[in-house]
Amino acid sequence: MKTIILILLILGLGIDAKSLEESKADEEKFLRFIGSVIHGIGHLVHHIGVALGDDQQDNGKFYGYYAEDNGKHWYDTGDQ
């Protein structure tokens, strides 16, 4: 009787360990997916900024006029 209970207990723990491994794999897939979504959103925001001229730090074309120092400033619409 003790042997049967011990065998059933070992088999039961093996099944639980397998389901735990499967849930860890699913969690890793989900976190990897969320990471790739966040990474993609970052790229999208960067490319929208490039298209709108946010990356043009040294040529004074960021929504403003040229200054006396060759436009070496970041401009926004309030500094005109």
From Swiss-Prot:
GO terms for cellular component: extracellular region. The modification Leucine amide is found at L52. InterPro entries: Clavanin. Its main location: secreted. It comes from the Eukaryota. Transmembrane segments: none annotated. Residues 18-29, 53-80 form a propeptide. Pfam families: Clavanin. The keyword Signal applies. Exhibits broad-spectrum antimicrobial activity against both Gram-positive and Gram-negative bacteria. Has potent hemolytic activity. This is Clavaspirin. It comes from Styela clava (Sea squirt).
